[in-house]
């Protein structure tokens, strides 16, 4: 990145920020879709039941922990690969 001029660095930063936002929104969408379809079965009420709320909380926690672990493993792999 040191070899890029200021304009190129700014463009690269914008591209990376847009990609990061897209990935975040994709993760949020996946989490929402998965947890909703796994936990919400009763559509007779406009509010979530206690059981549904607990299920969604557990589902979201599990999903986020899994995503964090995958990120850690990727970072470990990348560090090992770059060290070769």
Curated annotation (Swiss-Prot):
Its main location: mitochondrion. It is a peripheral membrane protein. A motif (Twin CX3C motif) lies at residues 35-59. GO terms for molecular function: metal ion binding; protein transporter activity. One of its GO terms (cellular component) is mitochondrial inner membrane. Disulfide bonds join 35-59, 39-55. It is found in: Mitochondrion inner membrane. GO terms for biological process: protein insertion into mitochondrial inner membrane. SUPFAM superfamilies: Tim10-like (SSF144122). InterPro entries: Mito_inner_translocase_sub, Tim10-like, Tim10-like_dom_sf. Keywords: Chaperone, Disulfide bond, Membrane, Metal-binding, Mitochondrion, Mitochondrion inner membrane, Protein transport, Translocation, Transport, Zinc. The twin CX3C motif contains 4 conserved Cys residues that form 2 disulfide bonds in the mitochondrial intermembrane space. However, during the transit of TIM9 from cytoplasm into mitochondrion, the Cys residues probably coordinate zinc, thereby preventing folding and allowing its transfer across mitochondrial outer membrane. Heterohexamer; composed of 3 copies of TIM9 and 3 copies of TIM10, named soluble 70 kDa complex. Associates with the TIM22 complex, whose core is composed of TIM22 and TIM54. Interacts with the transmembrane regions of multi-pass transmembrane proteins in transit. Mitochondrial intermembrane chaperone that participates in the import and insertion of multi-pass transmembrane proteins into the mitochondrial inner membrane. Also required for the transfer of beta-barrel precursors from the TOM complex to the sorting and assembly machinery (SAM complex) of the outer membrane. Acts as a chaperone-like protein that protects the hydrophobic precursors from aggregation and guide them through the mitochondrial intermembrane space. Belongs to the small Tim family. PANTHER family: MITOCHONDRIAL IMPORT INNER MEMBRANE TRANSLOCASE SUBUNIT TIM9B (PTHR13172). This is Mitochondrial import inner membrane translocase subunit tim9. It comes from Schizosaccharomyces pombe (strain 972 / ATCC 24843) (Fission yeast). The lineage of its organism: Eukaryota, Fungi, Dikarya, Ascomycota, Taphrinomycotina.
